[in-house]
Design a protein with these regions (language model features):
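Second-shell loop/turn segments in exported
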Residues: 34-41, 102-109, 147
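N-terminal export/targeting and maturation segments
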Residues: 25-59
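C-terminal motif of bacterial Sec signal peptides marking the signal peptidase cleavage site
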Residues: 16-19
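Positively charged n-region of N-terminal signal peptides that target proteins for export
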Residues: 1-4
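A cross-family detector of function-defining hotspots
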Residues: 47-89, 110, 115-167
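Acidic/histidine-rich, surface-exposed loop or edge segments in extracytoplasmic proteins
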Residues: 28-36, 94-103
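Bacterial signal peptide processing site
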Residues: 21-23
Length: 167
C-alpha cells in the first residue's frame, strides 16, 4: 500500500512538472519587438519612446517616403538600426536591424548565435531563401508578412532583421 502511494505521488509530480514546462508557442505577433532597458518596443508603434530610451548616440538619415506622406527615417546606433515610416504624424517603427550581439530578439537570439540556436528558439516552421525566415504566415510568396530574418554566414547569425514591410 505504501509503495502504491509513493508511485501515485511520483506520477502526480511528473504530470505537474510536465505542465510547468509549457512548450514555446510558434512564431507570432509577440515576437516582433525588441527589448531595451527592460521595456519592449514593437513594430508598427510610435518610435519616439524607443529613440528616447536609446539616447542621442545615433547617425540619422531621412528620405522622402515612397509609400507614405513624409520622410522615412533611419536611426543607426552601434549594433542596432531603427527604420521608421511616417503615419498619422508619427514616426512608426518599420524595422529593427541587429548587427552585433549587443541586442537580442525577444526569444534571446543574437548575432553570433548558431543556426541550431535559432531553430531551438523559434522552431522548425521557417523557410530559407538565403535567410532563415519566420513570418506570420510562413508563406514565402507573402512578401507583406511581418517577419524576423536571420542572415547567416555559414551556420552563424551575422545580422537579424525584424520588420514589417510597408508595401
Amino acid at each position: 500500500m505504501k509503495k502504491n502511494i509513493i508511485i501515485a505521488m511520483m506520477a502526480i509530480l511528473a504530470l505537474l512538472l510536465c505542465a510547468c514546462g509549457a512548450k514555446q508557442e510558434g512564431f507570432g505577433q509577440d515576437d516582433l519587438g525588441l527589448e531595451v532597458n527592460g521595456e519592449t518596443y514593437y513594430l508598427r508603434t510610435d518610435s519616439a519612446p524607443l529613440i528616447a530610451a536609446l539616447g542621442d548616440g545615433y547617425e540619422y538619415s531621412e528620405m522622402v517616403s515612397c509609400v507614405y506622406d513624409g520622410q522615412d527615417k533611419t536611426f543607426a546606433y552601434p549594433g542596432l538600426t531603427v527604420n521608421t515610416v511616417p503615419v498619422d504624424g508619427k514616426d512608426i517603427i518599420e524595422m529593427f536591424t541587429l548587427t552585433d550581439s549587443t541586442y537580442a530578439t525577444l526569444r534571446g537570439c543574437k548575432v553570433g548565435d548558431s543556426r541550431e540556436a535559432v531553430i531551438a528558439a523559434y522552431g522548425e516552421e521557417y523557410f530559407d531563401d538565403g535567410y532563415i525566415n519566420y513570418t506570420l504566415t510562413n508563406d514565402p510568396a507573402d512578401i507583406q508578412a511581418e517577419r524576423i530574418q536571420f542572415e547567416m554566414n555559414g551556420d552563424t547569425v551575422s545580422a537579424i532583421y525584424i520588420y514589417s514591410p510597408s508595401y
